[in-house]
Structures are given as structure tokens and as C-alpha cells.
């Protein structure tokens, strides 16, 4: 079923080029916060256009958040979600809160609007085998809607994603630069967001 969802995603969505480019840019500019902020911006401004059409986030705030959290991000960069444990929750909560603030709309009529979706997308690009992707409909489908306690709901969603990876690893291919978490997101997007399957 996950493979069918991923195939449906790839048949309908041409935006995977943005994921590939953003992944490449983050890899290429890793350790350089201004360039990393630009790399994340490529994906966020396109993938989360529903929010950022009302106003951009502050790239300087994102750059500062990256700089302040670089050692933590380095420690998570090559982690696998299967290593997720209770001891990670405080770190994830802290990162989530920092990125939630950095990625809020900086100007315009929705100034200050925050996006847990943008946070998950940014964190995933920074540690693609550790942080899961979601959107509003996907979060609701898994009982993790984030209108209250977004970081806590994201941790719950990561635990659910970890269980899915445990079941799927080695059974569902993830062609580079995709990860098994990206393939699961493609399935979730096809099933819950677009209802293609």
C-alpha cells in the first residue's frame, strides 16, 4: 500500500524536483547557516505556498536559528528515526519551538502566523532519516493535529513514523535522495491529502 501511494505521488506531483534540489543545496551548504537558510527557503516557499503567499518568513531569523542549533543539528544529521528514544524528546521540543518561531510569517496581514508544517519540512531536510514530514491532513489522519501542543504532537507523529519504518524498512525502496520517511510522506500525501488512493 505504501509503495502504491508513493507511485501515485510520483505520477501526480512534479514537485519532487524541488525536494531533490533542496536536498542537494542543504548537503552542499551544510555548516554555512546563510546558505542553508536559502536552501531551506527554496523548498519552504514552494511546498508551503499556501502559507507563504501571505508573506515570507524572515531569512535572518532562520539563519540565526540554524547557527544557534548547529551542534544539535549536526548530532541529528545522520541519525535514523529507529534510534528515536525518550531522551530525544526535550531536544526535539526545543528545536521545534525554535524553528516554529523562525519560520513564522514576518510581514503582511498574517504576520506572526506559525506553521508546524514548515517546521517538519525544514527539520526533515536537515536530518532526512530522522525527522518525519507531515501536513494538516496527514497530522489529523494520525490523530496528531497540532492546533494545541504542536511539538508534542510532532513527537507523537515521529513515534508513529518510527513504527512504520520498523515495518517497512527493506520492503519498500527509497531511491536517493529519498529516504524511507520521504516515501512514507508520499504515501500519506497521496492517501490523506490528495485522496489518490
Language model segments and positions:
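Short hydrophobic alpha-helical segments that form membrane-spanning helices or hydrophobic packing faces
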Residues: 118-125
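An N-terminal alpha-helical hairpin/helix-loop-helix interaction module that forms a charged
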Residues: 1-110, 128-197
